[in-house]
Each structure stands twice: as structure tokens, then as C-alpha cells.
Amino acid sequence: MAAISDVDSKKNIIIKGAKLHNLKNIDVIIPRNKLVVVTGLSGSGKSSLAFDTLYAEGQRRYVESLSSYARQFLGKLDKPKVDYIKGIAPAIAIEQKVNSTNPRSTVGTTTEIYDYLKLLYARIGKTVSPISGEEVKKHTVSDVTDHVKSFPEGTKLLLLAPITIKENRDPLKSLQLFSKQGYARIKYQGKVMRIDQVPEDIGRQFDLVVDRIVVKTDEDFYNRLGNAVDNAFFEGKGQCALEDLGQDTITVFSNQFEMDGMKFLEPNVHLFSFNNPYGACPKCEGYGDVIGIDEDLVIPDTSLSIYESAVFPWRGETMSWYKEQLVNSAYKFDFPIHKPWYQLSERQKQLVWDGNDHFIGIHKFFQQLEEKSYKIQNRVMLSRYRGKTKCSVCKGKRLRKEANYVKVGDTSISDLIELPIKKLIPFFDKLQLSEHDTEIANRLLKEIVTRLDFLNKVGLSYLTLNRKSNTLSGGESQRINLATSLGSSLVGSMYILDEPSIGLHPKDTENLIDVLQSLRNLGNTVIVVEHDEDIMKAADEIIDIGPEAGTLGGHVVAHGTFNEILMSTSLTAEYLNGTRSIEVPTARRNSKNYIQIKGARENNLKNIDVTFPLNVLTVITGVSGSGKSTLVRRILYPSILKEVGGYGEKAGQFTKIEGKYGHIKHVEFVDQNPIGRSSRSNPVTYIKAYDDIRSLFASQKLSKIRGYQAKHFSFNVDGGRCEKCKGEGEITVEMQFMADVHLECDVCEGKRFKKDILEVQFEGKNVDDVLNMTIDDAIQHFKNHKQQKIVTKLQPLQDVGLGYVTLGQSSSTLSGGEAQRIKLASFLVKGETKEKALFIFDEPTTGLHFHDIKKLLKSFDELIEKGHSVIVIEHNIELIKCADYLIDLGPEGGENGGFLVAEGTPEEIADRIDSHTAKYLKEKL
């Protein structure tokens, strides 16, 4: 390798002496405008290099170039611990955080597609009257003069303005005013008469003759006519008429935007914005839902028919009268009372809610209860069915009704954003516009179509633009950010992505690789922190950080193309070239216990029956959007939680739950949310090992002499902790106009405790030294000094592959995958209980190297051996091949998903032709 000083910084990004966290003063050269993968064990220092060093420096330099006024909103960025970085480009990081909790944020607004749609509808939308279906137009002065031009020269016309005199005015006085303004005639009851000759008893409605016209062709005539038409529109309050005296025909013009007796709003951008009071539905203010009668509570079981009392409040002696009304009169309007609710058409469902002349609908039923809410039983009844419900005015469309009269290609904007992306693309491809509209819309359509195309490529074709951002999974929101970045087509930037393959089925990974390569081909450097073998194969260069994790990591162990990496001796290379592998179990476990969910039909699930075997490793697979999370998160978890006596969210729509699961006493859903928000929360407090460590320090000789107890070694209560920073180790300085600055506490120097507490040592280490040890080091230290109780509690953290984390590392700095594994470890600590639990994991391999997946599988086996059950949602084939039982949903995502494609052992599924998972599974088996 050439000396680092000789490398050309125009073609490479040069990092010299990176020493942040566990990085061992390393030099790295990253080629510019290439796709580079950074890989290595969890905790080896990949993120420290990619995010905390490269991104931090790219961001910092960009911010430094801004004015001080702009900088105050961006906060101060620390310089990373590195000698220097040359050739760096402006950095964009795309992380896996589900970033939006805003209920107004949707896929359309995040990707900016909705902004372009608003413009499109405002510019070329045609307003259509809901009464006649005709296009609403307003006339201008030139429309009237053009009409006059169509008559032959010499034709006699009258230009009229319709007048209506108000109740409190005298018609004769009003006519005198017109006379003073220079008007001489009116037309009343079909006759033209002079104003000074009108009868005394004239009515309040007549036409004012603004001008008598003899058609000519010269310029002056049309100039005079233009002024006259202006006056006619003014006097007629926006209306005027041309009467052809020869043919006795009248043509009416209006410069108001109206038709069929309705006034319409002229399209503008704000009309289509649900975040603007002008365009938002007045009832729900643009949220799409309101607090009201919750449909799911009123009809909790959609597999029942009206006859079987699907409408829950219409049960019991008093209320069944409402049901009888509908059942007895259904034949009059041909309503199927024996059909299950979920099979009814939208119109039939709406009828039950709205009612008709023969029966009272659900809406009216609750209205009657509200009118008599002074009765206690009515108030109880109402409170039982209250919840978030679709807004009754806009039907969840978020916009005022006038916005939906505007159409492009016969479709309103609300209907458009309800279509999945894969149907939107053909809609715009087939859109036929006039030449004039095409010229206006061309650039907008180009932006819309490219962005839709990117969403399609990153595997999100099943989403609708109206989907709320806060209901997306981590992988989905990351890929939406990726598509948004692509849509803005920046050039010469540095994109740093954190495991974009999360939540992607191997089938979708191929498209993702195309997207990353197209980002590179635009002229950007794309740096990806990734463990996925397919993405590594597609990379131009791979940087492997290792050899192990934590203090044993932080070196560059291999650097080069995929084939060069295969020749090296790093752990990554050994798993890639087959020296090491994750073994396929020789026998699959089977079990007599199971949970069966019948008739699952939430979101896109197609009324399926699914059996989950217990006491084994059950894995749910399927492409993105096939319904895995819906089945497990929305149906299995809340329903089994209720069965074992827990209190959970309301379950999604399904018929019933049955099976042999009496031995399960707890249900744990282990997701990737942080284990604690407070900066004092850390792994060792979470698994309750810190209590033993404090007791150990309190039992030392010096502690006894000074009277210290366990609480003196806690940084959560007063006593031993530093008084100035309250055990935080840092002081937060609030800057009025800038971001808060965190400074190391000058009293304890970041050690959290008072000086005299730190004088207490156990085998040469004080409490601060212990908190700064990695878990691997701490286990060794306590083992050597016979502290088995502490070792037993720390061991599971090492088993799940977190040996590199320090005992006192703040929870807020842990990644989603790490937080999930700490939760897993805390359950392994409790392990040997009589009460058996069901563990549900959502993509536990996030952020895991092959070597770590091996450890994770060992932890799962340990839980199962202790009699617990494990159900996992997963895309990683290495984990899928080790399952005892697979449940494959699909075949595609979105509308074409939600079916049970296959279930059984991996061997049974590998032979299936109709399953996407089978193809990839076969290669591994």
C-alpha cells in the first residue's frame, strides 16, 4: 500500500488516525464515486467509522460553511477523534430510525410526491359538477367578445345584465340611479322599454340593457364592446347575456365559478393540502380520523352476519329491536342479512351505518343515545364504543369535499393517494392530456413518475401515498428516506446507509442493489454498513473491521474487492468462503402444544387460519408487505396477551384463537425500541447486575470503616454520586439560541461519583473502572475473583454477542439491534422459572454478523430448552434455515399478499414452487 500522504484526495476519501470509541488509530482510504460496504462483527467499530467519524465530519464541515444565523438552529457539532480527513464530500446519513411520530405525516408528504400532486391538480385539474357531471368553467370578457365575432356583420344584438332589487330598496329609485349612470332602457317581461316609461308597479327582477349592438369588424368596435361587457358583468353581479334580436335566442355568460346552481372553489395548491386550514376537512382538521364511535368496537367480529348480531350494541333485550327492524325489512331493499360482514360490499356496509326509511342506522342509533345522555346507561353505552374513527364528513380522505370535485384523468386526488404505488405508475403512464395541459404538466409528471419508480424499486410498491408515516416499520421508513434522496438526484455527495436490507426479503434485495448502484452512477460515493452477502458481492470495495468486537475490534482486517476479501483470514471471509458456517440442525424439534388463529383478516390478510407450534423455534417469513407484522403484532400478540391475563392493545380483525397453550403464563414482545430513554439507564442496570456490584463495593473493608452502604454506589440517588452533575457525568449548558452543549463535569471529571467513593476498590478497580469495562473484561475480572453471582448475570449478555458493550454505556447510544439483544439477555437471566413464556421477536438479526447470528441461535435454543416458546419474524436465510417450523406468507406484498403460501419444516418448504422464500432456502439447504 502506498504511503497515505501520496494518495490523491480528489479520487479518494482519506481518513488518517481514526481513534473514536474502539477504533485503533486506523488509516482508511475509500475510493470516491464507488459503492463501498463496511462490514464486521457487531461492535467491531463499523458505525464508529462510518457514522461517528465520516458522517460527523462531513456534516460538521458543511455546517461550518453556513452563516452564524443558520448555525444556531443546527447545534454545535464536535470534531471526531481523527488526525485528518481529506477529500470528504457533503454527507447524507440514512438511518433505521422510525422518525415520524406526526399523525399528519404520510408516505406522500415524506417523499414530496404529494407536493407535486397538489401542484398538478391546481394547474391542470378540471372541476366537474357532481350534479350533471359537466366541467365547470367561468367566462371572461374575451369569451363574450369571441361569441360576438361568430355573428355575421350587421347582426343586431342586445347586451343584458340581470338585476334583482333587494327587499329594502324601492325599484323605481334604483331605476333612477341607473338612469343617472347613463343607462336608458330595461327589458321587463319580454319587452324592451325606456327607464322613464316603466309602469309604477314594476317587479324586483328585470334585465338592464347595457348596450345595443350592431356587429362590425373594426378594432374600435371590439374595444368599446370589451368595456360594455365589463360593465354588464359588474351590474349583473357576475352574470350577463347576449340576445340575438333576429333569431330570438339568448346566450348566458357567468364570470363566477358555478354550475347547476352550485358555487365551486377555483383550484389552487392550498385547496389540496390537508395541512392547510383552507383545504383540510373542517370536521377532522385534516387528520382523517376523529374521536367518535369506533367501527371496530361496534362490529368487533366481522365474520358474523347481521342476523347473527354482528352489530354488537344491538344485542340484549332492549336494543335488539333495532336489529329486528333491519332483519324484518331487509327483503324490501334486497339486503343479505345472512352474509358475513366482511363479505358485504362497501355500499351495503354504508347502508347499515346510514339507515333508510325502513330501519334506523348505526349513526342515528348513537345520535339518539347522545340526545338522551342524561340517562346513565346511555352514557355508559356511548363510552363503551368511543374511539378513533374515520371522519364521517371526509370518510378519512382528510380534504374538504370541494377538493374532490377536481379531477385529473377522471380521478380525484383523494382516490389517487388511496391507490398502491404499483397501480399509480400505470395510471400516470396512460394519462392522456391536451397539448396545452401537457406543456404545463410535463415537468411535474416527470418528478412524480421518477419518485414513484424509486419507491417501486426499493420494494415499497404495496404502500399507498396516504399511509401514515408512524405506522411504517424501521426498514420501510429507511427505504422511503432512500427513495426521497434518490428523487432529489444530488450529485457529488456521500451517502452513508445503515443496513438498508433490513426488513427486505432476499427477492427484494436485488432491486435495492440496483438502486444503490444508480445512486453511485449519478456520481455519489455510497457507503453502506451491511452484513448481507448479496450486497457485499455487488460492492466495488469492502472494508472489514475487526477482528473481534469491542476492545478486540477497531482494526481494518481486510480491504478490497469481494474476491480479495475471500482470500483473507477474517471472520467475515471465513463465513463467506465456507471455512466456517452456521450449521443446519440435524433434526427439527416438534411439539404437541400450539396456538391457532382462525380467520385473520386485518389489513391485507385474506381470512387465513394459521397454526403456531409452541416450545420450538417458529419463524414467519414472506416478502415485504406480505402481512407478517400484521399477523404477529396486530393479531397474535394482543390476543394471546389477553388470554394469559395481560392487558394489551385491541387486537386486529380475526375470528377466534384456540389451541393448547395453557402452560404459557407470560408473553414478551421483544422489539427494537430503546431499553431506556434516560442517560443513566445502561445494560447492567437493565439486567439487574448492578445491584450485586454495588453490594460488593459496600462490603469492602474501607466502605465498612466509612459506613458506606450499597446506595452510596448508585448514581440515581443522592449519597455517593457527584452533587454537581447528579451522577450524569456531564453538565448540560442551555444555550438560548443554540443547541444545548454537553460538557464533562469539572468536579468529578466525568466519573459520576465523589472522590472518596472512588477510593473504595475491589481487587484494584473502583466503581468507575468497573462501569468502563467491557462485558467480556468484567466477566474475566469477576471470575478471577470468585464473584460467581455477578458472572452469572453478565454471562447472557456475552452469550447474545454483546461482550463488547461497556457495563455503564448509556442506553441512548445503543442501536436497535443491541437494545433488542439486551432484552433477550435479561430474559435469559430469569430463564429457570416455573412459569413458561412466549417470546416474539421482530427481526432479531438486525445489525448482526454471521458470527453473531450463531450466538443468537444458541440463545434461542437455550430459551426453548428451558421450556419457553420462540416466534420470530425474519428475512435472514441463515436464521430461517435453522427454524423448526416455517410459516410463509405472500405470495407478494400489499393487495397480492396476505395468503398463507406454505407452512412446515424448512425441508418441506424448500420444495415449494409458489414460495419466494423456498428458492433462497433451497440454496442454503
Model-derived features: positions:
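Conserved phosphate-binding elements of NTP-dependent enzyme cores
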Residues: 1-925
